[in-house]
Amino acid sequence: MAARLTAVIALGVAFVSASPAYSNTTSSAYLCNPAHSYPSGVSCDATARTLITPAPSSPSSAYFCNPAHSYPGGVSCDATARTLITPAPSASSSAYLCNPAHSYPDNVTCDATARTLITPAPSASSSVYLCNPAHSYPGNVTCDATARTLVTPTLSSSSAYLCNPAHSYPGGVSCDATARTLFTPAPSPVTLTEVVTSFTTFCPSPTTLVAGNKTYTVTKPTTLTITDCPGGCTLTRTAVPSPVTLTEIVTSFTTFCPSPTTLTAGGKTYTVTKATTLTITDCPGGCTLTKAIVPSPVTVTEVVKSFTTFCPAPTTLTAGGKTYTITKPTTLTFTECPGGCTLTKTAIPVAYTTTEAVSTFTTYCPQPTTITVDKQTITVTAATTLSVPVTQTLTKPVLPVTSAPSASASSRAYLCNPAHSYPGGVSCDATARTLIYPSTKDAVTGAALITTIVPAVPAQTGVASGNCAPVYVTITIKEIQTVTVGLGSPVYFTSSSQAPSVSVDTPVYITGSSYFHNTSAPAPTTNANATSSAYLCNPAHSYPGGVSCDATARTLIYPSTSTASFSSISGIPGGCNPAHPGSCPSSYFDTTIPAQATASATKATRRGSKMVRA
């Protein structure tokens, strides 16, 4: 019995983009911090991380200094006493003389006669990393003049969520030094490539356009539709990934308002006059919350032949079987990595979205309400789970995953991605991350579904005797899915009851039967379709059966097809394989191969265990 129906082969594409890890590769132990402020007009270069000192007008006074800083006017810092060493000023200069009426930090006093600062000897416990009371620090942080340590004020409700410009944040997020709030850079655009049989484009000015091996000349602004794409036309477009959000309906929630604002929830408006943590419990019908999905960091491991790293402090480092001793801040380059050096980096994946059409929208209504779905207004009278047929589209997040370990060629248990779609009704178990194959009782085998798919192109004419140029045709398999195969290419089934109706002159072979004209002709020993499948693959995934993914073209690379050797068939030295179009002359088949064949060719029928052309 033969039946037909059509299902859809989905195209799964995943993108991976990661933000670089924070590191200093050119800094030294005394680099300045752009988030700090420095006295005497000194600032910090945000790129070079070095202090920029304004032109001096006269020498500086001798408050506790930092040997890591530079000072104007030839002034230097004594590393032991932590006092400034000032060159003798000119007789006419008095700009840096101290004032006995002023007070100075760290118990420094002003000599009323000489008008110079008198600095007490530093304690034995002081070090070059103690803070400086003469400096100012962000976030109301102060320096204890006695202990020389930073004192951080207790955060109030209005400042508990302020960020720190001196800190680094994942995912490319940075801290605004003025507002002390986090801001996220716009996502980087990604390039998407697809192969189509026709497309429409707008040309705003005169130009020439090449598509499907033809050149089109446009002389004025025109909307152009291209339908002639033999072999498919490749389109490339740029897209910006959308922020990934999650929407949920809750009966109560808590939120923090950092500044005065108004908030509407559950049909009520709340006025906030100051920084407040607000708890909303009155949500008749449910309050809708939208949250951003923050991807977790992933660890990426790679093996390299050489690498460069920065060591900010004395340490020991082992690489390539050798141990290196670092005695000071150093940028180190390794070129000796016999067998490769393994580097481990942490990165934040960028989230992208994929849109899918759904036929049913399901939601839970905790109490009586009305809901509008796909232009339908539904009245709910009691708490219920509601399922509504829809034609709208929903958007779900697709987060990249780390690469899975390779599995043996005979194993189907390599890790899959639940966000991807797979051909032939195959799905991915979200918990076990393994592929779930449909029952072979009512469908062709998963292997047959995968290996017989080839890129769909418009039907072409041309099957020359002895040189079988494939004519791509569409067949319907057991009401499961539609695949496209070349004229003369085999389509395998597990039993004769699964043989489909074939709309063109394409032989259908039954597994285990004598499906060649000559019974001595051996079957292929591996996959009969050695070309790649039409859906894009992921180089980070592993595939069974020795199949790999081309990192550039994103297409599957199948191992070469091999055919059992034999001496001759029907007197043909070296033999031929009818599963390979062009390898057998027309005399090999039951009937002569027509010189031309199109999509309207005669219908194939099955007789016994062999296919013949009607």
Curated annotation (Swiss-Prot):
Signal peptide range: 1-18
Any one of the GO CC terms: fungal-type cell wall
A single MF term (Gene Ontology): structural constituent of cell wall
Keywords linked to the UniProt accession: Glycoprotein, Signal
GO BP terms, alphabetized: fungal-type cell wall organization
Glycosylation, residue list: N24, N107, N140, N213, N518, N529
Function of the protein: Probable self-resistance protein; part of the gene cluster that mediates the biosynthesis of enfumafungin, a glycosylated fernene-type triterpenoid with potent antifungal activity, mediated by its interaction with beta-1,3-glucan synthase and the fungal cell wall. Does not encode any steps in enfumafungin biosynthesis, but because it is related to a fungal cell wall structural proteins, it might play a role in self-resistance toward enfumafungin.
Family: Belongs to the SED1 family.
Name recorded for this polypeptide: Probable self-resistance protein efuJ
Taxon lineage: Eukaryota, Fungi, Dikarya, Ascomycota, Pezizomycotina
Name of encoding gene: efuJ
